[in-house]
Amino acid sequence: GKSRLAAWMLIVNALQADRGHVFYVAPTQGQARDIMWSTLLELGHPVIAGSHINNLQIKLVNGATISLKGADRPETMRGVSLKFLVLDEYADMKPDVFEQILRPALADQKGCAMFIGTPMGRNHFYELYKYAELDDDPTYKAWHFTSYDNPLLDPSEIDIAKRSMSSY
């Protein structure tokens, strides 16, 4: 669902950012690799010029770079100019990572950010969602989808999981 959408958004935005940079950021670099690396390679295959698993970077045919990063090491994201950014599981990140490091990296190119994740109570991700939901700021938009909206999941499997899993 949301990770596959994020991969498509990264590829499309990178293709529109001639020689530019786009980031996918997860709570840790290991999570970024586990969640996104193979999906990007699969979906982007026709437009990938090269990939480097050691530094988790994919170079596209137009010279743009997709980098996978971990929010637990924010110093690795300083000093870059970004056209697009995905923050996955934003509720599990410190808000300063976006506010102090990544938001400024988007400014000079008027870049966009996509925040995705699983709700984790009322925290900075919740506040951002509520802000976007108000529609007072045209630069923010909120969407809410459940597992039932995911065409890749069988609804009966979701029902079985709901019955067998505890809620916390």
List where the protein language model places each region.
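Phosphate/NTP-binding elements of NTP-utilizing enzymes
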Residues: 1-168
